[in-house]
Amino acid sequence: MTDAATSTPTVEDAYATYHERRELSVVQPKGSLALVNTQWIDSEQTIWGVPGVWAPLSDGESGLRVMATPADNIVVDGVLVDGSAVVRGKDDPNPSEISFSDTVTGFVIASEAGAYALRVWDANSEGIREFGSIDAFGYNPDWVITAAWTEIPGGVTVGFEHLKDDGSTRAEVVPGSITFSKDGIEYDLAAFKSGRALQLVFADGTSGVSTYSVGRFLFLAPNPDGTITLDFNRAVLPPCAFSYNFNCPLPPKQNRFSVPIEAGEKNVLKKDGTLLHEE
C-alpha cells in the first residue's frame, strides 16, 4: 500500500508548486512588481522618486555618477554618499548596489549602445500592494512539445522589436532552429540566448483575448539528443505585464501562432480579480 505522504508528486502537483513559487518571485524586493522607475541618463538630472542628482560618466566608463548630501540618505556599496560617488553598471564585473531607504533600492543597467539607466525598486510598491494572483490555465499536456533542435554554427542575427522602441529592432543572436509539426502545421521558431537559457518570445490565438496582448515568454534548454522540449505550461508573462517600467521584446513573425495555446500564464490580477494593468 502506498503511503500518500511519500508518493511521487503528479505532473499537476509539480505544476501547482511551480506556479506558487512563480507568484512569490514577482513580489520579492526586486521582483517584477517592485520596479517603479527606469530612467535613462544622458545628461545631469534628477530622477523621479529618488533623491540626488545623476549624470553619465565619460565615454567608456561603466555606470553613473550621483551627487548628494548625507541628508539624501543614498548608500552606494555600503557607503553613505557625501558629495559624489560612482555607481557601477550591470556591465561591470562588480556592479554597485544602491539603497535609498529600507524598502527602496536601485541598480544601474546598460544598453548595447553604452547608455545607462537607473532602475528603482520599491518593496512596498503599489503593484505589490494590489497584487492578487497570476491567472493561468490549468495544466495542459497537449502543449508539451518535443521539437527538433538544429544548432546554427555562429548563430544567425534576428531583429526583435521592443515595446517602447517605436518600431526599431534590436539584434539578437539565435543559435539554432526549433522545428516541429502540430495538428498539420509546421513551425520554425526563433529563440535568442538569455543567460544560460534560450528565450522564446511568442504570441498566439489567446493573445489579447484571454492572455496578455503583448505575448509571453518560454525559457528553454536543448537536450543532448538533439531535441528541445517546449512545455508551454511554463509560459510566463513578460515583466512589462507587471510594471510599465520594463521594455519587453515582441514576438517576431515566425513566433506568432495562429492557434490558441491554452497553457501557461494568462494575466496579472489584482486582489479583486480585475486586471492589474489595462493593456
Language-model segments: residues:
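N-terminal cleavable signal peptides for secretion/export
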Residues: 3-51
